[in-house]
Amino acid sequence: AIQFEQKAKAFNKDDWKNFLIYVEQERGEIHPVTYELVGEARKMAGKVGYEVNCVIVGGKGTKENAEKLLPYGVDHVYVYEDPGFEGFRADCYADAVADCIAANKPSSVLIGATALGRSLAPRLSTRFHTGLTADCTTLDIKPNTDMIQVRPAFGGNIMAQIGITKSRPQFA
């Protein structure tokens, strides 16, 4: 049998603050899932005093789309606009979002459960050696900033509550 043991590195939760939402663009427009994630993050942010920030990656027109998010209660939008980001390429987008995460150290990163999000999220959680809960149906947050992530399990017969307590950022 092959054994693999990995111990979590010590970290300080106080170093990791706020929410970061990946903003997906589709045909030059912000994907509707982004607004759903902003709403959920706003609810949780109010409980722990966090900001709701976004990161958007794309080609021409990305900065203009970023400005559309501000009326929805987003505190900051980090924009990665470059002709090289025309069309989704998972590794290039993961590099940009990972740069934003490393620079800002969000406690939680929310990514929509779209085809693009399902490609991007595992790449990012692997880079940061932390957990990812896919297909969440409910999100909440504890006073200690651990997210409670609820998702269907065993063919939808039960709802599993999942928490990432020993690493940051938390991906959902």
Annotate the PLM regions:
Residues 1-172:
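N-terminal glycine-rich FAD/FM-binding segment characteristic of electron-transfer flavoproteins
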